[in-house]
Amino acid sequence: MLVYRGHKGRLEMKVTARGRSAHAASNHLGDNAIYKLLPIIEAIKNMEPQLGDHEFLGHGKITVSDMHVKTPSINAVPDEATIFIDRRMTFGETKAAVLAQIEACIPVAVRDSVKLAELFYDDPSYTGYVFPVEKYFPAWAFPEDHPLVQAGQAARGVIGLAAAPASKWNFSTNGIYWAGKAGIPSIGFGPGDEVTAHTVNDSVSLADVVKATEFYAVLASQIPL
């Protein structure tokens, strides 16, 4: 278990294609929205080697993570299809540049019927009030010599863990807002192995849970006043 001092940013997007419905037996009368997305999906699949890289945070990532299709039935040509894109951004990559990368994947011939859009957190509160927040958060990292990072490293030593450089998450945490947008000093430390996160092998060692609680109990005493 290491002290983590940063991770990549994130931008969530969708690309929606619109076509024309028809019976599958007369598909030549329709305009299949799914087919319009195929070259875009292929371009995204092949994009990752060209994404940004950083010596600490690592290489940018991109994934087509979901697809929704509107169709009268499974015996019809779908008239609308949407893919959802998860983009993990390293240092040096900007929101504008990421959006431009996806726009460039849309073939000129279908740009009138295929549109890119950012995603927002816009679920209503219990009162019905909606406060949209963009699903974009920049990459962030605090230096190894930051007082909070150093306090975390000291706490690891107090609980008997061998010295090791502070590292970074490969996935995203709430630090994307606290540190990435609000600039609040943040570090991470916890049980579990992120390599198995969101897999059938996702698990946490109980011994690591106990050791993590020791760290949390000690951390505040290591922060300089």
Where are these regions (language model features)?
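Metal-dependent amide/peptide-bond hydrolase catalytic core
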Residues: Y4-L225
